[in-house]
Amino acid sequence: MARKKASAVAQEDTKPLLEKGSTRKRLSNADDDEDHATKRVKGGIEERTDYARWRMRDDHGRHTWCYLEDDDALKQWPQTYADKYYLGLPLDLPELPKAKSPLDAVRNGLEFFEKLQLPSGHWGCEYGGPMFLLPCVVLAWYATKTPIPWYYATEIKNYLFARAHPEDGGWGLHIEGETSVFGTTLNYTVLRLVGVDADHPKMVKARATLHKMGGATHSPHWAKWWLAVLGVADWDIVNPVPPELWLLPDVVPFAPWRWWIHIRQVFLPMSYLWSRRWRAEETETIRSLRKELFVEDWDKIDWAGNRNTINPRDNYHPKSWLLNLINWFLANIWKPYFRVKPLSDKAEAWAMKLIEMENENTDCLDLATVSGPMNLVCLYAHGGPDTYAVRRHKERANEFLWVNKEGLLANGTNGVQCWDTAFAIQTVMDAGLTEDPRWRPMLLKALEFLDDQQIRENVKDQDKCYRQQRKGAWAFSNKDQGYAVSDCISEALKSVIILQKTPGFPTLIDDQRIFDAIDTLLTYQNPNGSCSSYEPPRAGPWMEMLNAAEVFGRIMVEYEYPECTTAVVTALSLFHKHWPDYRPKEIERFINRAVAWIKTNQLPHGGWYGSWGICFTYATMFALESLASIGETYENSTHARRGCDFLISKQREDGGWSEHYKACETGEYVEHPTGSQVVMTSWALIGLMKANYPDRARLRKGIKLLMERQQPNGEWLQEAIEGVFNKSCMISYPNYKFTFTMKALGMFARKYPDDTVL
């Protein structure tokens, strides 16, 4: 009962839109915000919160961070090891016996990692990195007059201050990137909206850097759109985003339903608000930002003339001549002379209908942290502040937020729950410890989580809202988000089969539900044999000529990925081993065609390019696993041998591997300047061992590095960022340093049980 009371208090504390009259005044609504701010510390917010009062609430895989201002609630809801770990607080764990073998290191790692398992059975983590995610949430809050609790505002300020570039004070596209106009414009705006004064030294420094880069007129398309929504910029600076495209017949080769899921879900709310030229209520803060963000007087800016103005460091993917021509025609001919209101009204109505279907399919969570806040603003503009959809969106926006030792950030989605849990299970399996009773309670909880998170039905009217079949699938995060992904289905399915075929574990997911997952997986193969992520490609790479984002590459359509292809191949192979009579010919054909594509995707240097992890090391690990699944290894396969030789050529003197995120951008292997990384080292070792690479001494050197990096309490420390999307933006997978590292150690221990390494 006490825990329920504490949880209720915490739940109330994490709903900024529902702040009671007794709570603090909203920091970003009225024109007298600055007057309110001066009554508090400099900047209108506190210096810091009390980290002993933060709790991460896990409700069936839904994460919300709670700040307990009530002392009774504080006593009733103690911090867990996971809370303290996420917040960077001391864990005061005892030192474990020093590992004398790789298997000892796995056990020590599991001793630590088990303490981070959450009540619903999964492992949480921050999924940060991109520096444009938090602005999406905060700018949407401000535009919709959503109260921002002081503890959110305080830790937002702390996080952005911590992540400012140490030399120029700006912000980049992601946490390890160079300062950009995109990152600096949006994050400077966030700080002003949460109450930081313009004359704060850090703001003065950031503003000077922004002005040196040309000011906000030199920002990319997405930033200009957000500034127009706030009323900080005029809508004329935004290139056309016509919702009429949603009215095109499906047969049109560039119709939006053919675009990659993330870009079409961003284009949807963008087009709705662009069409309406809606802007938030003007405040003193908005008027001040008009002076702070631009190098010219606001009234003298040629807004239309700056539609295509962009700083070179933001212009990762320059707009094509074709898109520039289309934009010119839409802005100068179609919009002023031929755009008729009945058609625009119809387009806006259909766009809103698609947003409403997204709400229904995700319970107002939406696909991710960019489209969700954008949809919130659309719903607010459409129906006002009191509709259920607006209130529910505001509640669920909290699930995108995360608190770490630096402050409050926004995750790339609402989490990595199913993905990380699947890898955690496989880690124990690869070490040969699934039958060890010591780890059975942990594994059973993980299995129960995957049981709970399997998606049991397809989306309502899935063809109407352009969704892929998903019955029997798993999402990247949780079933509320509900977007099936080929590799997420595959890794979760493998983990379920592994445990349910292990003596002592119950069969929670029956055969029919397993078959449902297989039926859905079999819909993911592309004509060339490969697999993509959310759905098979619906248009070709030529669509990148319409890429308006400027800061991203490979964003307009789905692409083929060796990582996703491998995951599906290995899942189908494992399934076929246990259910040989279910759709055997289709599965065999799928696997053969997929592995054949893997071979064609190999690069001249022997590696594979990774799109979801950094970079060649990541993809080569998966590709070698694909080849091994059909019996092709270093000894008998030219492709496997070339892949291994590529990895070995990158091994460092200390035995590790060290790939920098620049490899994703340049397409060439780039060494990380800080030296070997445990995650990259683990990926390389896993790939080599999957391929039966024969030189044990090379493997031992890498394993030795992993063991030496392990801390006395069993953990590994965070190193460089691990993940990537759209070639140019990096994203964090902090649990990889546990799951893949223990997997590599466990595989070595099983392969060479008598080799103690140290």
Predicted regions, residues:
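Preference for long, amphipathic alpha-helical scaffolds in soluble/luminal domains
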Residues: 1-758
